[in-house]
Amino acid sequence: MMKSVVAVLTGILLALGVGALSIFGIAAPFFTYFFGPELASTALPAVFVLFAAAFAFYFGGMVASYKAPSRRRLHGVLVGVGAFVISPLVNLVAPDPTVRGGDPFANLRTPEAFLFTTVLLVLVLTVSYVGALRGETLFAHNQAVIRRQKTRKARERLSEGKD
C-alpha cells in the first residue's frame, strides 16, 4: 500500500515540477520578451497552460505507472485524479480571505472558468492514462531485459563450470 502511495505522490510531484518548469522556465521568458513583464505574468494564454499540463502529467503518469507495485495503469491515472482532488482540498483548508470574500472556489463561478477546468481535467486524465500505458510498457521491457541478462549470466557460469 505504501509503495502505491509513494508511486502516485512521486508522479504528482514530478507533474507539478515539470509543469512549473515549462510554464515559468519556458513560457514565461517568451511572454516577457514579446509582451513585457506586466502582461506576461497575468495573461498567460490558456493554450500554453493546457500544453504544460499535458506535458507534465504525461511524465507524471509514466513515472507512477513504472514505480507502482501492481495495477500500473490505475496508478498512472491516479496522478491526474489525485492532483484534482488535492487542489480543492487545499482551497478548502486554506482559503485566501483577499479573494472575493474568502470563497475557495471563486475562480470557478464563471462558465468560462468552469469550462476551462473541465477541459483541463479531461486532458489531464487522458494524458495520464497515455503516460501510464508508456510506463507499463517500459516496465515490461526492462523486466524482459533483466531476465535475459540473468539467463545469460547463468549460462555463462554453467559453461565456465564445465571447462
What feature does the model see in each segment?
Residues 1-163:
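Juxtamembrane/disordered regions of integral membrane proteins
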